[in-house]
Amino acid sequence: MAGASVEARERFLSNLRLVNERAQVEPEIIDLVEAFARLDLEKDRPVTLHPGTPRRLSPPVEVFLEKNRHISPTSRDFLAAYCQRIHEQGQVFLLNPTHLAHLLDLSPDRLGRLARTADRRYFSYTIPKRDGSDRTIHAPNPELKSVQRLILDNILSFAPLSASAEGFRRERSIVTNGRRHVGKKVVVKLDIKDFFPSITSERIFGLFLAMGYPRSVASLLTDLTTCQGALPTGAPTSPVLSNLVCRRLDRRLSGVGVKMDFEYSRYADDLTFSSQNPGMVRLLPFLQEVIAEEGFVVKKPKTRIQRSGGQQKVTGIVVNRRPNIARKEIRILRAIIHNCKKGDIRQQASQYAASRGLGNSQDFPLSSFKASLRGKIDHVRRVNPEVGGRLLHDFKTIPFNA
């Protein structure tokens, strides 16, 4: 089956399930056999259902096997091989819904009810976007959100991500994303339309299967992390799940970049390509075709081609010669600080809130104004420590408590 198409692999797995069902194998065992075979297929390895005990076992696998030492040697060898492979992928192994319930500190019955009713446990609201349209947020209720955080911390956070992914991960930011594209003759920016809504529950289910989890576990995890058939914008699990779904997209685009000599990175739904060869823009139709094949649509009105003769910005960072903040943004911050020192701070807070759509501008709290302004200055410091340091020095002289 090595090198087989996705359709051929799924036919093989379907036949594998059918053979075991006809042999009256327990459904839970069929799930594990399919999951183990899928791990081989995902790595283009020959499928081996009698692997023997691995030579080396990680401590968590040893502990698990010790607790289940009563099972037959054949079953023990199979579970040892399966659990070790999952652990080597940087993931926690989950054999069945009861195992998942234990990890999430829920009873199996409670887990089942929570998964079945998950769609009803969200509340929706809208927030304004920069272009004037509204973004709909689907936020989980406290109980579901706490379970999603456990899924994030115990299952998703350890899964390997693409090196091209710059958003929603530790030690990466809009600054590290911008640094990858400094000093290039051409920078191309593409934006994916309806990023989270286009990642359907079917894709999430397929992701959990590809990670090696049994169908019963993958189904529960999908129900707990999707809403109305897609990734919800307000769930804590959605950002990491989007990165995991995009691993193949990232791998394909970065692979083209290696061959065609351009840099590629992705920050959430913002895709950036840069090169010293201005002719790389001729690849745009092909790149958009790859993106479409991976189930996404490019928001064409937001496509930007930036050449070295003008300002080049990547996720808000100017990248012409070195990472920097746009002069206009620095001038605005200087003006706000100056006006606060010379005039009415509360008036400045109201104007600041109104210009950014931050609720009722007349009642915008000074504490929120101070925190927001300080956050913007700290952002400048991360990109340009010298300029940011001067802004911070001036900021500290504002008489907020006067």
Language-model segments: residues:
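Catalytic palm active-site di-aspartate
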Residues: K189-K193, G234, S238, G257-Q276
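Right-hand nucleic-acid polymerase module
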Residues: M1-I127, D134-T136, P140-P160, A165-V186, ...
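Short aromatic/hydrophobic-glycine micro-motifs
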Residues: Y213, F262, G295-F296
